From Swiss-Prot:
Species per Swiss-Prot/TrEMBL record: Agrobacterium fabrum (strain C58 / ATCC 33970) (Agrobacterium tumefaciens (strain C58))
Record-listed E.C. numbers: 7.6.2.-
Keyword Calcium in record: no
Subunit structure as annotated in this protein's UniProt entry: The complex is composed of two ATP-binding proteins (LolD) and two transmembrane proteins (LolC and LolE).
GO terms for MF: ATP binding; ATP hydrolysis activity; ATPase-coupled transmembrane transporter activity
Gene name as annotated: lolD
Record's protein name: Lipoprotein-releasing system ATP-binding protein LolD
One Pfam family this sequence matches: ABC_tran
Function text: Part of the ABC transporter complex LolCDE involved in the translocation of mature outer membrane-directed lipoproteins, from the inner membrane to the periplasmic chaperone, LolA. Responsible for the formation of the LolA-lipoprotein complex in an ATP-dependent manner.
Top-level taxon of origin: Bacteria
Residues reported in the UniProt entry to bind ATP: 43-50
Amino acid sequence: MAKKTVLRLTGVERTYGQGETSLSILRKADFELKSGEMVALVAPSGTGKSTLLHLAGLLEHPDAGEVLINGAPCNGLPDEARTAIRRSDIGFVYQFHHLLPEFTAVENVMMPQLIAGLTQAEARKRASALLDYMRVGHRGEHRPAELSGGEQQRVAIARAVANAPLLLLADEPTGNLDPETAHYVFDALEALVRQSGLAALIATHNHDLANRMDRRVTLADGKIVDF
């Protein structure tokens, strides 16, 4: 079965500032990401990795070009529609977990599901299953401060996919972890992506992890290129 294109960028441009102080990050950039595909985004700091992830995640608007999620153009959509797409179709993972400290692990994973309209019972059942899959189910009733760094990040990954998104965007998801823990967390992330058929774009400086993905891209002269 042919894989579906989940994310497409066509001729995307993004510039910050104006005049002599302007900084062009993306120049007529093209990119495609298909379901079940893991792509590593490897580039030096300051070259636009976060900008690319923000555009793909509908957190920023391109100055030109088009961003399509699951074949649907997203340019010009009102904020409410963009928010709805983010909630239903896109999951985000960051270097720092951003878990809500006052809630337990299972409650953190329940949160996006409750916002999406699931009942407490439905949300708790799925949250518990995801935590079990990420091998932290036994820590479900603990708050983030009581978890190790690797456990926190696995909870954050479970939260990111709680609403079964089509697209996962991760910005240095193992960057704050020691090498052994980073590989352990990535093992869980990779298994989840492969099992669910997610499309995943993962920014990382870790070349060992990048080499485990389906392909690698970088940013060069405002373009997104394979290497």
